[in-house]
């Protein structure tokens, strides 16, 4: 009989440790207040920093506290084109410039925004990773709703009062450059999660994996496996509807 395979050991579970010790903090929009709902408030970009474990850079923006005589520093996801010393305007009456924070209802159709709120006041949930953005498709003023296109291509209807940052998240094209070295992959995953290196099933012995063994590396049987298979067999393409490359052009309904 074979050994307990990797995904069976995973299923038993253990306490997950997320590698967040070096992170610079949560990147969120300002808490929604009177100044943003009715006018605008001005901040200045103090510095742009790298956040370990995140592809996009962060911007430290200092705003004057509307209620106390002090400065409040916020951490935003930096958009492409944002620079230190730049003024950032946040609010309903802010201008339509890169880096400014506006409610979606105040942006014309076709505007490219990022770090968009899913629910009003949640401080940013959609289009937050490097190079990503959300496109405003249309507004419905009667219901105070806005239709947006997400980075996945999916369309979503959200409140027109939900805020977004004008522009594209910085760090685009990051995944186009290959890592090339194991050392770079090591440092990448060291600040993410313990999911690397990952030994291929065909490189194992037959006791360790259903794809293991043989005088050359080959699976030796169909790699698809049924949903009802016992856990020791569940390796490969589980309950696959189809396999192989998609051929021809694909039409997506608008």
From Swiss-Prot:
InterPro entries: NA-bd_OB-fold (IPR012340), Rib_uL2_dom2 (IPR014722), Ribosomal_uL2 (IPR002171), Ribosomal_uL2_C (IPR022669), Ribosomal_uL2_CS (IPR022671), Ribosomal_uL2_dom3 (IPR014726), Ribosomal_uL2_RNA-bd_dom (IPR022666), Translation_prot_SH3-like_sf (IPR008991). Belongs to the universal ribosomal protein uL2 family. Gene3D superfamilies: 2.30.30.30, Nucleic acid-binding proteins, Ribosomal protein L2, domain 3. Component of the ribosome, a large ribonucleoprotein complex responsible for the synthesis of proteins in the cell. The small ribosomal subunit (SSU) binds messenger RNAs (mRNAs) and translates the encoded message by selecting cognate aminoacyl-transfer RNA (tRNA) molecules. The large subunit (LSU) contains the ribosomal catalytic site termed the peptidyl transferase center (PTC), which catalyzes the formation of peptide bonds, thereby polymerizing the amino acids delivered by tRNAs into a polypeptide chain. The keyword Ribosomal protein applies. It is found in: Cytoplasm. This is Large ribosomal subunit protein uL2. It comes from Candida albicans (strain SC5314 / ATCC MYA-2876) (Yeast).
């Amino acid at each position: 009989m074979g050994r307990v395979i990797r995904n069976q050991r995973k299923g038993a579970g253990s306490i997950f440790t997320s590698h967040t010790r070096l992170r610079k903090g949560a990147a969120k929009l300002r808490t929604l207040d009177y100044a943003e709902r009715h006018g605008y408030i001005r901040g200045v970009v103090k510095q742009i920093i790298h956040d370990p474990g995140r592809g996009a850079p962060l911007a430290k923006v200092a705003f004057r506290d509307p209620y106390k005589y002090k400065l409040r520093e916020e951490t935003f996801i930096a958009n492409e084109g944002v620079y230190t010393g730049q003024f950032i305007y946040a609010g309903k009456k802010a201008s339509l410039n890169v880096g400014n924070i506006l409610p979606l209802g105040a942006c014309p159709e076709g505007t490219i925004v990022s770090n968009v709120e899913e629910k009003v006041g949640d401080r940013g949930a959609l289009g937050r990773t490097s190079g990503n953005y959300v496109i405003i498709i249309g507004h419905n003023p009667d219901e105070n709703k806005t239709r947006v296109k997400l980075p996945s291509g999916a369309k979503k209807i959200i409140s027109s009062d939900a805020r977004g940052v004008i522009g594209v998240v910085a760090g685009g094209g990051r995944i186009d450059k290959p890592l090339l070295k194991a050392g770079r992959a090591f440092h990448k995953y060291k600040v993410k999660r313990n999911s690397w290196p990952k030994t291929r099933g065909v490189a194992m012995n037959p006791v360790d994996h259903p794809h293991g063994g043989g005088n050359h590396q080959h699976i030796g049987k169909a790699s698809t496996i049924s949903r009802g298979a016992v856990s020791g067999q569940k390796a490969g393409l589980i309950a696959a509807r189809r396999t192989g490359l998609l051929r021809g052009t694909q039409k997506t309904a608008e």
